[in-house]
Amino acid sequence: MLSVRVAAALARALPRQSGLVSKKALGAAFVATRNIHASGVWPPEKSGTAEVSSILEERILGADTTADLEETGRVLSIGDGIARVYGLRNVQAEEMVEFSSGLKGMSLNLEPDNVGVVGLANDKLIKEGDIVKRTGAIVDVPVGDELLGRVVDALGNTIDGKGPIGSKTRRRVGLKAPGIIPRISVREPMQTGIKAVDSLVPIGRGQRELIIGDRQTGKTSIAIDTIINQKRFNDGTDEKKKLYCIYVAIGQKRLTDADAMKYTIVVSRTASDAAPLQYLAPYSGCSMGEYFRDNGTHALIIYDDLSKQAVAYRQMSLLLRRPPGREAYPGDVFYLHSRLLERAAKMNDHFGGGSLTALPVIETQAGDVSAYIPTNVISITDGQIFLETELFYKGIRPAINVGLSVSRVGSAAQTRAMKQVAGTMKLELAQYREVAAFAQFGSDLDAATQQLLNRGVRLTELLKQGQYVPMAIEEQVTVIYAGVRGHLDKMEPSKITKFESAFLAHVKSQHQELLATIRADGKISEQADAKLKEIVLNFLSTFEA
């Protein structure tokens, strides 16, 4: 007779032989034995032992032996937003981890005996001894058209109070930049609507153009005006002309102006936010922009500003005990910005023909462009727009220094009409600045020098532009044409601004067909040139009167 005791021993032996040691399995064996014993089929028939064994084996193998395994560690120390965690042997760099309090962190330092984790929120809820578990996910953010018109934080969470984002697509924040093969040279214009930029330092789609200057010189104004100017293209039906915008505010005051929000994503990180979030925000915004680039459309991303991101990264690195270098920045601070800005690209037709244009902003101290971070970013980008405090206080706004500002690849993308009228303007303005410095020492100037000074003063006045009033490219062409061709040389400089607004109003109301021709053809034909000259001269005769 097979006793319950023997059956129990058999139940213990079976799973041990098959490598399945489980309380559930043992329990199933006991239940099976009890059921057989209760059925009263004793003594068993000749093959009873084999039947009992097979029944027990079926019950044991049918038991649920799955278990949720989690790799965990413990907090050794916590301070200044940095947690030292013991364990987590297989954690990846920049992997999200979760503390027992529910707060998220990101692993940055992978050391032999511990992991340095930066907290992505208030670290007051983290204590020594807390359990930390891996999530297995590298930091990623939601991407897609659903984000347009929304304000999100560095992790893609909404902070505008308009409910959750419906996007199902997510993308890692730290993706590799496209290589040489998928790219093509910059050839399409990215119009800012600012006369001084579109004529002198043109930007192309897929370019990286740095906006650099001291604080309070109008860097953010140029960026915001560029976003507002895209309204004229995004309101149209041509998808190839549309330019979606991502504005990454790093450590800036909270953005309240919602102009042109329907085609814009705002990634907001204020100065009061944790350093890791200020560090992540540009990469998050870049991933959102890459979604449009890789789907054959065009996007513009503005990083306002990368100086604050570098400071946040320096703060994190020093707290993680990484070796400091020049100006106490870590050795890889160049890589911090290069891996971000290299993701801006113009893709070839085989890869969809999309583009991502980057306008990084860098703040200088007392105009010192030779500091560490400014020189790094200047060497990475394809040109820079240099803003001067002195020009700003003189009332020349935007305060662009024409001599120091340059666009290395954008001229290939400049429209032919603008090239025709603005081709000589940069040279004339540079000569004017040079001569003006010497002219103040003496009054005996020859006629050619006097002419150069007169033209330079009027062109400088003509390039002044108010904030939040970007101009269409055909309107810019007509105004600059009047100045470059010498039609304004005899006008008082103080009247130039008044002339510009009156002339534009006249052209828009009376000569729409000329504007449409310049916009459609992208150039000034001989007939259009003659017509434009006639319009300017006729208007001047009535304006002067």
From Swiss-Prot:
GO biological process, one term: proton motive force-driven ATP synthesis
Site features described as Required for activity, chain residue numbers: S405
Keywords: ATP synthesis, ATP-binding, CF(1), Hydrogen ion transport, Ion transport, Magnesium, Membrane, Metal-binding, Mitochondrion, Mitochondrion inner membrane, Nucleotide-binding, Transit peptide, Transport
Cited InterPro entries: ATP_synth_asu-like_sf, ATP_synth_asu_C, ATP_synth_asu_C_sf, ATP_synth_F1_a_nt-bd_dom, ATP_synth_F1_asu, ATPase_a/bsu_AS, ATPase_F1/V1/A1_a/bsu_N, ATPase_F1/V1/A1_a/bsu_N_sf
SUPFAM superfamilies: C-terminal domain of alpha and beta subunits of F1 ATP synthase (SSF47917), N-terminal domain of alpha and beta subunits of F1 ATP synthase (SSF50615), P-loop containing nucleoside triphosphate hydrolases (SSF52540)
Keyword DNA repair on entry: no
Name of the gene: atp5f1a
Name of the protein this chain belongs to: ATP synthase F(1) complex subunit alpha, mitochondrial
Transmembrane domains' residue ranges: none
Subunit structure, interactors included: Homotrimer. Component of the ATP synthase complex composed at least of ATP5F1A/subunit alpha, ATP5F1B/subunit beta, ATP5MC1/subunit c (homooctomer), MT-ATP6/subunit a, MT-ATP8/subunit 8, ATP5ME/subunit e, ATP5MF/subunit f, ATP5MG/subunit g, ATP5MK/subunit k, ATP5MJ/subunit j, ATP5F1C/subunit gamma, ATP5F1D/subunit delta, ATP5F1E/subunit epsilon, ATP5PF/subunit F6, ATP5PB/subunit b, ATP5PD/subunit d, ATP5PO/subunit OSCP.
Keyword Ion transport attached: yes
Family: Belongs to the ATPase alpha/beta chains family.
Matches recorded under Gene3D superfamilies: 2.40.30.20, ATP synthase alpha/beta chain, C-terminal domain (1.20.150.20), P-loop containing nucleotide triphosphate hydrolases (3.40.50.300)
Subcellular location: Mitochondrion inner membrane
Topology in membrane: Peripheral membrane protein
UniProt-listed Pfam families: ATP-synt_ab, ATP-synt_ab_C, ATP-synt_ab_N
Residues that, per the record, bind Mg(2+): T220, D304
Binding of ATP, residues: Q216, G218, K219, T220, S221, Q465, Q467
CC annotations in GO: mitochondrial inner membrane; proton-transporting ATP synthase complex
